[in-house]
Design a protein with these regions (language model features):
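Extracellular glycan-modifying ectodomains
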Residues: 1-390
Length: 390
């Protein structure tokens, strides 16, 4: 008699789900008793189960591992539908095919407005894990981020907007694509961010004659301390499928070995009282994340910790008077940390934050040399491109 592994798997998981439900009910019996008197049985039940379900981490691990055993490359996920796993073990979010026309028009109008104020503008396209010529076809079948980015950049180029496509430089320089991204997270590694920081400064100097770091001192990796921490990081994707399926990533911490001094302000709350100050480590690095033994701690956020709505970073030891406004997503956290070492002021704005920053006022008051928008290929939505042109 031939054993059907799929039927056995289904039966086992029905038994496990029943057991988990029973244990959760018993562990939260007091909450359920109170819920019966609350008048909102359905919502309260959902809340209790979602917040207190027994063995949740173990269940995620077991379910994902079972899918791997049954040769599934699309791992179930409640929020995204599927998490994609390629043959190299990399995990990916899916990304929809987006009509980027209106987003490109917003960006073109934003660039025109800045030009009228004699402020330079460039759109910088950060890569996504779905890399041309490297990623398995199954990823491109479910992730349209590169297609969206290609169409977006094409419209900008046709309208004379300055762009820097880091994806093309990865191909041109034949970088080791195994080391560009974390396997378990959607972000680039710190070493990739450092490379991108170098390319960005080169571009700014060549395109706008800013003369940033003319001696290449602050961009020389030999002037930084690198500390590699082995198997310490379970990223955003790995947390969704379980570490038994994804494994753990190594993390490389990079910080200057030269003298630094900063004053950092939260532009939303106070532009006069710094929230952080001191050298690079004291002002920018978050030891609670860096030294945490919890593998789910977000190592990517070791620099700055949060995606602040408006963060003003002043380097008191640099006197080149270069001021840059960086409109960003979370990819920019490590890159911005490195960029801050070689310019007088770097302001970071994240349009996802609420209350939303008044960009027009910030630009009018800021006296910026350059405004940059630096996004990865998966953020083509109205929020990220809502520049509020007036």
């Amino acid at each position: 008699m031939k054993i059907n592994k799929y039927k056995i798997t289904a039966v086992l998981f029905l038994v496990i789900i029943f057991w988990i439900g029973t244990v959760t009910l018993w562990n939260n019996r007091t909450e359920f008793k109170n819920m019966l008197h609350s008048g909102d049985v359905i919502n309260e039940t959902n809340k209790i189960y979602s917040e207190n379900v027994a063995y949740s981490d173990t269940f995620i691990d077991m379910w994902s591992k079972t899918q791997s055993v049954t040769d599934v490359q699309l791992l179930d996920d409640a929020e995204y539908g599927n998490i994609i796993k390629d043959e190299k073990g990399n995990l990916y979010f899916p990304a929809n095919d987006v009509d980027v026309t209106s987003l490109a028009e917003n960006t073109i109008n934003f660039a025109k407005m800045l030009s009228e104020k004699n402020i330079k503008f460039a759109y910088v396209q950060a890569p996504n894990k779905d890399l041309k010529g490297y990623t398995d076809k199954i990823v491109s079948d479910y992730n349209f981020s590169n297609k969206n980015a290609d169409e977006f950049l094409s419209i900008l180029d046709e309208n004379g907007v300055d762009t820097l496509d880091l994806r093309e430089l990865i191909i041109k320089e034949n970088l080791d694509r195994e080391k560009l991204f974390y396997k378990t997270d959607h972000h680039w590694t710190t070493t990739t961010a450092f490379w991108a920081y170098n390319k960005l400064v080169e571009y700014l100097n060549q395109t706008y004659n800013l003369n940033i770091d003319p001696n290449n001192y602050y961009r020389d990796i030999n002037n930084y301390n690198l500390t590699e921490i082995k198997e310490c990081y379970l990223g955003s994707l790995g947390r969704r499928v379980g570490k038994s399926v994804s494994g753990l990533d190594d993390y490389t911490f990079i910080e200057p070995n030269f003298k630094t001094d900063y004053k950092i302000y939260n532009g939303v709350t106070s532009k006069t009282n710094p929230i952080f100050k001191g050298n690079f480590h004291k002002a920018i690095v978050k030891d609670n994340i860096l030294t945490s033994n919890d593998v789910t701690s977000n190592k990517h956020a070791t620099y700055f910790e949060w995606d602040y709505g408006d963060l003003i970073i002043k380097n008191t030891l640099i006197d080149n008077d270069v001021k840059i406004l960086l409109i960003k997503d979370s990819y920019s956290l490590p890159l911005a940390a490195f960029l801050s070492t070689c310019i007088s002021e770097l302001d970071m704005v994240d349009l996802r934050d609420t209350p939303k920053v008044d960009l027009q006022k910030k630009i009018a008051d800021g006296d910026f040399d350059v405004v940059l928008v630096l996004y990865n290929t998966e953020v083509f939505n109205e929020t990220m491109f809502g520049f509020d042109i007036k």
